């Protein structure tokens, strides 16, 4: 029988093979330094890889009876553009009825689609990577304004520094990743060792 939920080690091998996971000396837009960097769109540029990852994450939701009992009357929500390919893959695998995505405009996160109160089914928030959980929390705020209940949340990779639940909803992930983060160059070991910096964006 095919294992539809690959191990975290197998997922990391996929991310390394596709170039979505790299090691080095990286500086985030926030100014923080780290020896690890995920660029998830590189994994989702390949259909076969994207499908493996999306189906694997969808299985995490399908085995949850509280979620599976509400399918297909469910909405998959992507809190940012990076989560859109994951969202479409998970929606297809779950045969969920709706999909929405949010974007940040003028400093405020809002849904790309025009949505009225009461139009959204019970929601599963899906992203490619959760580093701090800020985008997830902002999206939950949007859902509350629209009266849409949150029944699930997940990502391909969740940093251990991010929350592991939103309210009483646990955050599911294929990989839980721990990485040192340095607020500035004074605290960074790679800076101390003279390792060249690479400035990256999300």
Feature-to-residue mapping (PLM):
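Short, well-ordered alpha-helices that flank and scaffold nucleotide-derived cofactor binding pockets
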Residues: 59, 88, 92, 141, ...
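Active-site-facing substrate-recognition patch
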Residues: 1-67, 202
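Short glycine-rich phosphate-binding loop at a beta-alpha junction
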Residues: 66-80
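Short, glycine/charge-rich flexible loops or terminal/linker lids adjacent to PRPP-binding catalytic cores
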Residues: 81-124, 132-137
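PRPP-dependent phosphoribosyltransferase catalytic core
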Residues: 2-13, 140-202
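Short amphipathic alpha-helix with an adjacent loop that forms part of the alpha/beta core around
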Residues: 66-68, 112-118, 185
């Amino acid at each position: 029988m095919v294992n539809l939920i690959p191990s975290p080690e197998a997922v990391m091998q996929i991310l390394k093979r596709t170039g979505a996971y790299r090691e080095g000396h990286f500086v985030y837009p926030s100014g923080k330094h780290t020896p690890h960097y995920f660029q998830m769109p590189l994994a989702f540029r390949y259909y076969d890889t994207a499908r493996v990852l999306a189906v694997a994450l969808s299985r995490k939701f399908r085995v949850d009876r509280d979620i599976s009992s509400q399918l297909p009357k469910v909405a998959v929500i992507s809190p940012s553009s990076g989560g859109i390919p994951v969202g479409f893959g998970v929606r297809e695998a779950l045969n969920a009825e709706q999909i929405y995505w949010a974007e940040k405009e003028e400093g405020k996160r809002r849904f790309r689609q025009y949505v009225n109160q009461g139009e959204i089914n019970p929601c599963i928030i899906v992203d490619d990577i959760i580093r701090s959980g800020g985008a997830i929390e902002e999206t939950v705020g949007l859902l509350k304004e629209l009266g849409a209940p949150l029944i699930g949340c997940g990502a391909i990779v969740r940093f251990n520094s991010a929350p592991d639940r939103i309210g009483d909803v646990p955050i599911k992930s294929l990989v839980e990743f721990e990485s040192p983060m340095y607020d500035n160059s004074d605290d960074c070991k790679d800076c101390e060792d003279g390792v060249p910096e690479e400035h990256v964006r999300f």
